[in-house]
């Protein structure tokens, strides 16, 4: 095999050189036509030798070794007691299989073997998987294994995301400077503040235009993501698991496999990167829309909270069926002593106090009106006021014999303890065996502190256990769907996505807040995996009051549903909701398969968000006025992503009523206009003057 390996797919190339004995990524980016002079490329990438530097050029490969002259954090950090902290790996073998290449390297002195696997998918997404094996007889402690990829020197900005509970994934963009911009997650889960993806971008890159390089970690535990520019001017991105003290100690012939890093390049902006990720995920055989359409869901939490009553819930089921709901979900409060949030977690047995005849009667009622039944669990958690905790207080994560501080009046079960694991699995499995349950909402409502298994740090074991739990429950109950919820928008990542079928995007159903939460979460996660519900007129989370149209239009852009006491909805409300669910069902094939587009705008007061069919035959857009416009006449609405050479019929549709405007007359095109795709994207159409916190839908159909 040549020293140079060229992977290319879908307009992306990755070129790796092993001439120096270590794999070095020479290029990750725009596709390079095969047949180029490999030797010439290698020569162009040999560093000069400045004064006051190493006497010979040093090749810094993917392992970033100090032994090769790299002055910075190496890819692998670890040691044996008093030795083998510095490494020098040499490639011993490489295997090319289509667009996947695997390198195995050995450091004979340190008695370590490392493997790096580069897979360039059909969608042009690069998956980098690495692992280290201890070939020695003594133990080797792994401190970290972080995967790094170089990006061009002309990258200018970092785009990543911050947040908090009920305001997740808010963008922040800043200049790349010398040093390291590091984002660490230490909650034991992917937190509300987690970035999900981190981009390095050319200076002018936007949603629609320019080059972007992004890294996302396929992992649901502690993590680190970074962008680094060294003093010599080289820039790289990295991601990996954040390991706690002695969390990974390898005995002889044991292996640590780091979480896969998912790397995406696009030369057509953030939306181009997003499209590659969505396409990759949708190509999975297990992707939910490859199995069935996404059903309209009613979750009754905000309708009843802990006040469970059969007659009330039966009336909700009747109302839900009337307006076209397809799935009914009973949330918290059905089990053990769970009459409030301070007791009962851990006792996954139907409460005789609330449901003396069991849940079967309610399930039968829900099924009788044509709805699926779903049920809420929070199996990783336990209240100290529970039968489980009283019997097994040692089954919680804890270090030093201390009980960790309570968080939402609960503790975390140590699922690495097989007894605790089997307790949760068996009680959950028993409920699923007894009742016809199509779907479970699985919550995770606290951070992990002092997360130890018998005193040893065990975040990794906890994450592996929940992956196992979901997989075993689904294997035992084919067709079961699991929604991952973690106080709403936590634990949304490319690790959990292979084990769950849906994410609860945020506990915040306020439509104004959801505009940005939904928009930026969907950069990585396809909208069909993101729960987006219409809440009541007055949001329980913020107290804001919004029109039906704004709430309904906002909730359309995901796996749609409701959180509303429908028994209190008026006849007009129910008619609106029936119209909206009918429209969602008519458009969900488009919404859940098309290319997501986010038009660049000159104002931050409004935004255009859309989905374009893969064949560009149709599209649906949302124009949202978030706050009052900067101008008396807002900037034009541009409909991006259409076929530039085709003509489209463009019109406003109002399945949930009209947006409230501040204008004597609407723009002339409202009832329909035929316009070329090129003009719709470049010139656009005059925007209406909407009141703040309003949104409208625009259809485009090729004619």
Question: What residue spans do the PLM features occupy?
Answer:
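Short Pro-Gly-centered flexible turn/kink motifs
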Residues: 248-267, 693-700
């Amino acid at each position: 095999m040549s020293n140079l390996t060229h992977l290319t797919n879908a307009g992306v190339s990755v070129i790796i050189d092993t001439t120096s004995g270590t794999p070095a990524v020479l290029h990750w980016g725009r596709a390079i036509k095969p047949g180029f002079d490999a030797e010439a490329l290698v020569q162009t990438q040999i560093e000069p030798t400045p004064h006051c530097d190493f006497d010979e050029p040093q090749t810094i490969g993917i392992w970033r070794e100090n032994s090769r002259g790299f002055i910075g954090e190496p890819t692998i950090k670890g040691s044996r007691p008093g030795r083998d902290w510095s490494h020098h790996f040499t490639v011993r073998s490489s295997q090319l299989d289509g667009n996947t290449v695997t390198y195995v390297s050995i450091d004979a002195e340190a008695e370590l073997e490392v493997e790096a696997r580069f897979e360039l998918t059909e969608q042009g997404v690069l998956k980098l998987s690495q692992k280290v094996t201890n070939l020695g007889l003594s133990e080797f402690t792994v401190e970290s294994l972080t995967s790094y990829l170089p990006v061009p020197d002309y990258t200018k900005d970092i785009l990543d995301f911050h947040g908090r509970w009920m305001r997740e994934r808010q963008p922040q963009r800043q200049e790349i400077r010398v040093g390291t911009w590091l984002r660490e997650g230490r909650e034991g889960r992917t937190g509300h503040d987690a970035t999900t993806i981190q981009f390095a971008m050319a200076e002018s890159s936007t949603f629609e235009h320019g080059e972007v390089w992004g890294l996302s970690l396929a992992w649901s535990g502690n993590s680190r993501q970074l962008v680094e520019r060294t003093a010599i001017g080289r820039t790289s991105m990295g991601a990996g698991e954040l390991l706690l003290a002695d969390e990974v100690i390898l005995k002889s012939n044991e292996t640590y496999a780091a979480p896969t890093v998912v790397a995406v390049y696009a030369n057509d902006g953030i939306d181009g990167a997003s499209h590659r990720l969505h396409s990759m995920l949708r190509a999975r055989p297990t992707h939910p829309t490859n199995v069935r359409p996404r059903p309209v869901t009613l979750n009754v939490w905000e309708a009843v909270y802990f006040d469970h009553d059969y007659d009330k819930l039966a009336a909700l089921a009747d109302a839900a069926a009337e307006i076209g709901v397809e799935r009914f979900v009973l949330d918290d409060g059905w089990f053990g002593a769970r009459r409030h949030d301070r007791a009962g977690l851990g006792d996954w047995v139907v409460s005789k106090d609330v449901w003396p005849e069991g849940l079967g009667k309610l399930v039968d009622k829900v099924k009788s009106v044509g709805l699926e039944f779903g049920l809420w669990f929070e199996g990783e958690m336990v209240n100290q006021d529970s039968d489980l905790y009283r019997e097994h207080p040692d089954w919680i994560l804890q270090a030093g014999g201390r009980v960790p501080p309570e968080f939402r009046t609960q503790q975390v079960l140590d699922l690495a303890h097989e007894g605790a694991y089997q307790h949760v699995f068996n009680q959950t499995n028993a409920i699923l065996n007894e009742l016809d349950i199509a779907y479970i909402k699985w919550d995770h409502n606290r951070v992990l502190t002092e997360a130890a298994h018998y005193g040893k740090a065990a975040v990794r074991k906890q994450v592996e256990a929940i992956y196992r739990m979901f997989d075993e429950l689904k294997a035992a109950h084919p067709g079961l769907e699991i929604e991952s919820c973690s106080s709403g928008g936590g634990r949304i990542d490319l690790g959990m996505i292979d084990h769950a079928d849906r994410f609860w995007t945020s506990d915040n159903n306020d439509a104004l807040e959801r505009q940005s939460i939904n928009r930026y979460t969907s950069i990585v996660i396809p909208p069909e995996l993101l729960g987006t519900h219409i809440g009541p007129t007055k949001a329980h989370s913020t107290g804001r009051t919004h029109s039906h149209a704004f709430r309904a239009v906002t909730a359309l852009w995901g796996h749609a549903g409701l959180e509303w006491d429908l028994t209190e909805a008026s006849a007009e409300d129910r008619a609106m909701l029936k119209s909206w669910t009918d429209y969602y069902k008519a458009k969900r094939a488009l919404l859940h398969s098309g290319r997501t587009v986010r038009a660049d705008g000159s104002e931050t007061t409004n935004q255009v968000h859309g989905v374009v069919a893969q064949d560009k035959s149709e599209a649906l857009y949302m124009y949202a006025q978030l706050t009052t416009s900067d101008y008396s006449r807002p900037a034009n609405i541009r409909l991006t992503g259409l076929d530039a050479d085709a003509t489209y019929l463009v019109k406003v549709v109002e399945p949930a009523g009209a947006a409230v405007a501040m204008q004597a007359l609407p723009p002339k095109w409202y009832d329909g206009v035929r316009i070329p795709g090129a003009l719709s994207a470049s010139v656009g159409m005059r925007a209406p003057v909407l009141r703040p916190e309003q949104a409208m839908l625009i259809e485009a159909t090729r004619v």
